Amino acid sequence: METVRSAPPGDGAAEALLKELERQVQDVVRASSWWERHGVDCAILALSLLALPAGFLCLRAHNILAFATGITILGVCHYTLTVKGSHLATHSALTESKRWSKILMIFFLEVCTAFSAEFAKFNHVNLHHVYTNVVGLGDSSTWKVPLLNRYVYMFLGPLLVPIITPLVALEHLRKEEPRTALRTLGFICLGLYSQYWLFMNVSGFKNPSSALACMLLTRSLLAHPYLHVNIFQHIGLPMFSPDKKPRRIHMMTLGVLNLPRQLVLDWAFGHSLISCHVEHHLFPWLSDHMCLKVKPLVSKFLHEKQLPYNEDSYLARFQLFLSRYEEFMVHVPPITELVGVQ
């Protein structure tokens, strides 16, 4: 068991700190326009949808540069819709309407991502966010595959994500109500077949195997950073016992890490998954743009209150995981106990 010796504030002080930070963030949100709160991210998602025809048409050209451009457009747009769009929709961060939030969640998760909306929301919002880095609940253990060695997992494993995603969804459908399962299955099939149809009829592929290969290629374009980001920002940080989990502000500041800004990943994954992950875990209802806007405030507040604000580079985390792969991804993590908090 690991012990944090410099004890953070106790329960009462922790609640007061969180309320003070929430008040400051709410003041920023109230002073922000609709464009800042939702419009910027909605515009990015809309542009990604509008760019899809150009990507499919580029693949018609018998030119390697045009083909590469088409694959890049389709790949980046795919991840923008399936990662950024799905993530924001799951947190109802794209609109304040409950009805539209539900519609957008189904569209981005089931049609675009080929995954179950209900299953994703339960695992991400109800488990991962509520029990961040709590062993057996929100500890990101679903990303661990102990059977794979470090090189296979870090370099080849990501290529399996587009194949595994719909298979996991189909496996889960057996536990859903028949009506929900049929809806999810229908939308997953619609999304996959629509992309296949577009490759065959708009891009002009002559045989199904070529279309399927391009589907896999575009869905794998950013699979490596997608997998890496999901493990870098939680695994290797303090883990907590379910019966001794710390107060929320300690859980989120100790167990979450920000990566530096990176143009492509910021666009495709969103600020809340890259450079503002701490802010996102503290305020999951904020859009990507709002997470970026409150980042200086949150960083300053946590530093002033002598609370952790974890930051590291992508390369540093990559090297760390390669060198300590068994410790992080195979063995049971040590439990961190905060002295003076529980």
Swiss-Prot record:
Q: Which GO terms describe its biological process?
A: fatty acid biosynthetic process
Q: What class of enzyme is it?
A: oxidoreductase
The keyword Transmembrane helix appears for this protein: yes
Q: Where in the cell is it found?
A: Membrane
Q: How does it sit in the membrane?
A: Multi-pass membrane protein
Q: What is this protein called?
A: Fatty acid desaturase 6
Q: Where is this motif: Histidine box-2?
A: 124-128
User: Main location per UniProt?
Assistant: membrane
Q: What InterPro entries does the record point to?
A: FA_desaturase_dom, Fatty_acid_desaturase
Q: Where is this motif: Histidine box-1?
A: 87-91
> What keywords tag this UniProt record?
Fatty acid biosynthesis, Fatty acid metabolism, Lipid biosynthesis, Lipid metabolism, Membrane, Oxidoreductase, Transmembrane, Transmembrane helix
Where does the motif Histidine box-3 lie? 277-281
* Annotated PANTHER family: FATTY ACID DESATURASE 2, FATTY ACID DESATURASE 6
The pathway it acts in is: Lipid metabolism; fatty acid metabolism
Locate the transmembrane regions by residue number: 39-59, 63-83, 100-120, 151-171, 185-205
What superkingdom does the record give?
Eukaryota
One Gene Ontology CC term in the entry: membrane
Q: Which EC number(s) are documented for this chain?
A: 1.14.19.-
The UniProt GO MF terms for this protein read: oxidoreductase activity
Q: What is the lineage of its organism?
A: Eukaryota, Metazoa, Chordata, Craniata, Vertebrata
